[in-house]
């Protein structure tokens, strides 16, 4: 039976400094653990898939045990991204590689299922409310649904229309058909993944989140909090897993 509402966390714990303001692997690992702990402890998510394309040197067995103790399943997928294109095209291409690997290798992301994709090192404070509101929806994004007026459409730093890729909901079938290969047409300089998703979503039915997701964590490119940062208690608990 296909699983519904799996959480897919895309991750890059070891990342080139040129791509991110937060590039130190130890800091990125701590932030990843902060996110995992909150997802495991504080939401109704039953299955979490963490997929990292940088093959970090870390033993995830303790956090997997923590998940089991809370009645959750944590699947960890680690691989090494193909760096030839990743290094020239940027993190958009790398993000796409991670998602493609997860869809192709996870035991929980199967046809007929649905998942919430979240950027690694982040947590959605109001996730359970969002999950309830969108239980019957197959594709939900922060922009750009067709009902949006142009003035409401999210834009990137260069003013290009885009969707947020930090957090969205997708059916596995929907994603495989419409977005799985979007990354091959991306380049951080001229066409980041947020803009490529925008173009592709214009052609297919989808909806917007009924309430704004409250994102906890720090933007890796800017080293600034989203809506809030993890608390000192979150960070202290995460360090016990290091």
Features from the language model and the residues they span:
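ER/Golgi luminal nucleotide-sugar-dependent glycosyltransferases, focusing on the catalytic module
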Residues: 1-242
